[in-house]
Amino acid sequence: MMSKLGALLTICLLLFPLTAVPLDGDQPLDRHAERMHDGISPKRHPWFDPVKRCCKVQCESCTPCC
């Protein structure tokens, strides 16, 4: 009985090694949460490049206005 369990455990470890399980240290950092923690909003971040849309006529219905 024990040899069957040992063989089954060996086969399972060969097919699915423990190194295939993702650990918390393998996860990428959340840069957005890190920026918000530093107090820099995404709109004020130096890498943020907003697209400016301006209206040529009166600014009644366009957003954002110049």
Swiss-Prot record:
What pairs make up the disulfide bonds?
54-66, 55-62, 59-65
Where does the UniProt annotation place the signal sequence?
Answer: 1-20
What tissues express this gene product? Expressed by the venom duct.
Q: Which GO terms describe its cellular component?
A: extracellular region
Q: Which residues are processed away as propeptide to yield the mature protein?
A: 21-53
Subcellular location per UniProt equals: Secreted
Q: Which UniProt keywords apply?
A: Cleavage on pair of basic residues, Disulfide bond, Hydroxylation, Secreted, Signal, Toxin
Q: Name one Pfam family in it.
A: Conotoxin
Statement: the UniProt record of this protein carries the keyword Glycoprotein: no
Q: Does the keyword Disulfide bond apply?
A: yes
- Point out residues bearing the modification 4-hydroxyproline: 64
> Taking the first listed entry, what is the main subcellular location of this protein, grouped into a coarse class?
secreted
Q: Which GO terms describe its molecular function?
A: ion channel inhibitor activity; toxin activity
Similarity field: Belongs to the conotoxin M superfamily.
What's the entry's take on its domains?
A: The cysteine framework is III (CC-C-C-CC). Classified in the M-2 branch, since 2 residues stand between the fourth and the fifth cysteine residues.
- Can you say what this protein is called? Conotoxin Lt3.5
Species annotation: Conus litteratus
